[in-house]
Amino acid sequence: MGNYATLIGESDGIIQLTTWNVGKWDGKLKIGDYALISPGVRILSAKMITIGNSCMFGRGAYVTDSDWHGVYDRNEVAGSPKEVILEDNVWIGDSAIICKGVRIGKNSIIGAGSVVTKNVEPNSIYAGNPAKFVKKLDEQEIIPRKNFYSNPKKLKDDFEILDKLALKDNTLFGWIKSFFYRNKDH
């Protein structure tokens, strides 16, 4: 895991970063600097998944380098894995699926709910099932996520504002009440 990663977990959106290291399988996962990983993201490796700098993952996105079972022999562990590479500054939308053997070019965006089975050109938007080319992006206009960290004072102030907004409805009375009138999900 690189520097300045932001992982946002929730009780109903646990983040799963898994490498499968059994027998002939030696999964590896490399995540670059400034990654943003939202609730429910699953990244599962039986071979190698490389994620570049400033990549962002929407809620429930899934990246895998394996089928996890053979096509005919469902007991065959991990099928035949193929490396996955996400170059720098890639944005994977909510619930998108990135399949084995895929390379996503730098600055590209994958639309929510898309299923990516083939390589994606740099500076492009792809969407759909299967994902198809939608639009070319102007590389000169793209501002990478790492720029968010260029002013530490502003970053600290911004996070304090976000914390206040997230917690504004919390009160001492509400906290005490939660002990006596528990939500059925908690």
Regions found by a protein language model. Give the residues of each.
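Flexible, glycine/small-residue-enriched loop-and-beta-strand segment within the central core
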Residues: 1-102, 137
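A generic "structured core" feature
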Residues: 109-111, 115
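Short cysteine/histidine-rich zinc-coordinating motifs and their immediately flanking basic loops
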Residues: 12, 121, 139-141
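Short beta-to-alpha loop/turn elements within the nucleotide-binding domains of ABC transporters
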Residues: 102, 114, 120, 129
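Short arginine-rich
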Residues: 118-123, 153
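Conserved active-site beta-strand element of glycosyltransferases/polysaccharide synthases
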Residues: 126
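C-terminal segments of enzyme domains that contribute to small-molecule binding surfaces
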Residues: 26-27, 33, 76-99, 129-186
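Conserved catalytic segment of ABC-fold P-loop ATPases
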Residues: 105-108, 121-123
